[in-house]
Amino acid sequence: MLVRFQSRAHNYLDNILMKQSINKHHISSEEIIWTDKNALWYAEEYGDHISNDLTINNIGLNPNDILLDIGCGTGAAVKIASRICHQGKIYGVDPIETMINIALKNRDKPSNIKFILGSAENIPLDNKSVNKVIAINSIHHWKDYKKGLLEVHRVLKSKGLFFISNDIVNNKDCGHGPGPLHTNTDIMNELKKTGFIDITLQDYTLDNDGIHLIECKKEK
């Protein structure tokens, strides 16, 4: 039975927020002071968290997929994805320049990954340009999640898939505190409002970690 799965990254985030006197229940990633030192330390300690593997290995990636990772951070997830999606194209978008710089240094060479400084609310890609989108522990940090969901819908091709992955905490919620996206049901309701269909939820676990993985589809 699952008792408690807690990402180490959440503990580190709490430490940063306490030092900066920021309310973690009302925070976007841009509000954290991501100094080079903080970002480098985060990359070393938490960049390869198992949630990346659990997500990438359960979204049915194909060699020729065109994948977008929103809030890619240090690029750990897309680096894993590139070894499966080796004939396609992968985009990693993050609003933190230091994270993008670390991701660029860490990617395999040669690589089919393109890292872009940007946000969920203004994805720097064309309409209907990707067929899979992932957001791993990032949707709760979007400044305007409703606008972000509309942007995901815009860049997805017809029948494209969107996956939202969050760490399992206390068996029931997403571990990000009170807010409009506190539970999986909240997230799934917002996806439905945005026009996504075939919305499902599946949990995946490995050792002492696990994820909630929500999948949905753009109809056309």
Give each language-model segment a name.
Residues 121-132:
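A short acidic, Gly/Pro-enriched loop at the edge of an enzyme's catalytic core
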Residues 132-144:
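A short SAM/SAH-binding and catalytic strip from SAM-dependent methyltransferases
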Residues 203-220:
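Core SAM-dependent methyltransferase catalytic element
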